[in-house]
């Protein structure tokens, strides 16, 4: 019997997102519930312990003990892996952002596609029977039901904890103007681009081609600009290079993603965004001025497909090139309240000051229907079902073909006759890798290969004839 007054939390390798803010709410306002943070790395565990909270590694004996007793597991995504000791726990999925982009089952290409399909096969029982999912408005409810295959009776309707937490949280020094030795009347802007599926490590040079000109504009308009890069884009070569050169520049700050940026939303005067859901979170948190820097809008495979019309469901001055981006800083005080109110209603209609309490109460009251059983999915090896392999190991088929080559009157190269059992899987791996990396070139999103392509590759590498 699981204890609904023991909760465990995780947000990947960081202490942030909706799980972090609900965790803090439990700590400060719900003394009847005992919260624990589970971690994948010692670094994250040690960081949270330094803040004074209980944290354990997933693989530790203590986590196994707590996890086997806990009643609620708070996450911000549809998890790929559930530890065995979590079987039967209520999964409270707070997600990680509203918005226009396709997610989960709506993703049809990119490196995540295969992983998404796999986890929905492996974890479908958990997703369907044990998971509660937070949505923030009727529009987002419809969106996530379709994208994430949700059951309506397992939906929680409220605002995000990271946007509607009742109070302030401070896990680091918020006085960034003092750190940069800038006067108090300095305005603060943030540039927060989203992850690009096709240009994760060569984006920054396209977005910011002239840092000197940017710094001059910031000086002239009395701005500090924060570069808040997506974690998957932080290794962008040009970004790292610019960071080294300008790290001591008083007008730019390269954000450390170890610090939760949401803690200083109330300090932001201007938010420059593109397709990231952080736009909606900043809007909900009271940011008054926005710009949309979308120089790559419409380019193929720049990011995932839109499930909703981007132009209709965002607001702020549109910048399609670097010059227009620079001009934003001199026009940052224009009134956008009417558009902000329109977007707020579309994306945050379920939110109010009681949102976090609604979430907690819904999780406490939820009882999974363990009698509901899903159909069993059977998977078969094609060699066993269609061909009838008689070898003990799969590689035995390749040894068999190799023996036939040695007996053949055809003059196969000596290397092939001695190493076909290795060449055959090498060729398959090579073709599969090519198909994964050539989606744009082939103009075909399929990544599964055919039998003949493997032998075409062997033929090409070893100069074989069709015979």
Model-derived features with residue positions:
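Active-site and donor-binding regions of nucleotide-sugar-utilizing enzymes
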Residues: 7-167
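Conserved catalytic-core segment of nucleotide-activated headgroup transferases in glycan assembly
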Residues: 14-22, 27-28, 146-147, 157-242, ...
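Catalytic donor nucleotide-activated moiety binding site of glycosyltransferases and closely related
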Residues: 34-50, 215-255
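Donor nucleotide-activated moiety binding/catalytic core segment of transferases
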Residues: 55-70, 231-280
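A donor-sugar binding/catalytic signature common to diverse glycosyltransferases
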Residues: 73-102, 258-302
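Catalytic binding pocket for nucleotide-activated donors in carbohydrate/polymer assembly enzymes
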Residues: 243-244, 277-350, 398
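Asp-based phosphoryl-transfer active-site loop
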Residues: 374-391
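Conserved phosphoryl-transfer catalytic core
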Residues: 392-442
């Amino acid at each position: 019997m699981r204890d609904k007054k023991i909760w465990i939390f995780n947000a990947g390798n960081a202490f942030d997102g909706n799980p972090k803010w609900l965790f803090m709410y439990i700590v400060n306002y719900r003394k009847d519930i005992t919260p624990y943070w589970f971690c994948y790395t010692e670094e994250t565990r040690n960081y949270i312990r330094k803040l004074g909270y209980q944290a354990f590694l997933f693989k530790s004996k203590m986590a196994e003990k707590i996890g086997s007793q806990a009643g609620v597991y708070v996450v911000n995504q549809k998890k790929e892996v559930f530890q065995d000791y979590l079987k039967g726990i209520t999964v409270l999925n707070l997600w990680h952002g509203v918005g226009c982009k396709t997610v989960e089952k709506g993703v049809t290409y990119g490196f995540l596609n295969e992983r998404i399909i796999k986890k929905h096969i492996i974890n479908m029982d958990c997703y369907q029977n044990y998971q509660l999912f937070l949505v923030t408005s009727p529009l987002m409810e419809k969106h996530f039901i379709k994208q994430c295959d949700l059951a309506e009776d397992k939906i929680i309707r409220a605002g995000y904890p990271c946007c509607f937490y009742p109070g302030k949280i401070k896990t680091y020094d918020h006085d960034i103007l003092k750190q940069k030795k800038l006067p108090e009347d300095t305005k603060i802007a943030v540039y927060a681009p989203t992850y690009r599926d096709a240009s994760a490590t060569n984006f920054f040079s396209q977005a910011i081609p002239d840092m000197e000109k940017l710094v001059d504009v910031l000086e002239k308009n009395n701005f500090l600009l924060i570069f808040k890069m997506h974690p998957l884009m932080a290794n962008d070569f040009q970004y790292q290079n610019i960071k080294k050169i300008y790290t001591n520049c008083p007008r730019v700050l390269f954000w450390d993603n170890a610090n939760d940026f949401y803690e200083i939303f109330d300090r932001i005067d201007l938010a420059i965004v593109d397709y990231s859901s952080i736009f909606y979170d900043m809007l909900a948190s009271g940011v008054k001025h926005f710009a949309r820097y979308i120089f790559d809008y419409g380019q193929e495979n720049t990011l995932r497909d839109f499930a909703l019309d981007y132009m209709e469901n965002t607001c702020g001055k549109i910048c399609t090139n670097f010059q227009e981006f620079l001009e934003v800083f001199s026009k940052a005080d224009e009134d956008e309240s009417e558009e902000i109110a329109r977007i707020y209603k579309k994306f945050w209609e379920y939110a109010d000051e009681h949102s976090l309490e609604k979430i907690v109460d819904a999780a406490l009251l939820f009882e999974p229907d363990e009698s509901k059983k899903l159909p069993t999915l059977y998977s078969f090896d094609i060699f066993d079902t269609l061909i009838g392999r008689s070898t003990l190991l799969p590689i035995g088929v390749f040894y068999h073909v190799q023996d036939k080559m040695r007996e053949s009157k055809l003059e196969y190269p000596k290397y092939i006759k001695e190493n076909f059992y290795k060449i055959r899987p090498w060729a398959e791996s090579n073709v599969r890798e090519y198909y994964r990396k050539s989606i744009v070139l082939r103009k075909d999103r399929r990544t599964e290969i055919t039998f003949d392509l493997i032998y075409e590759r062997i033929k090409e590498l070893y100069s074989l004839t069709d015979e």
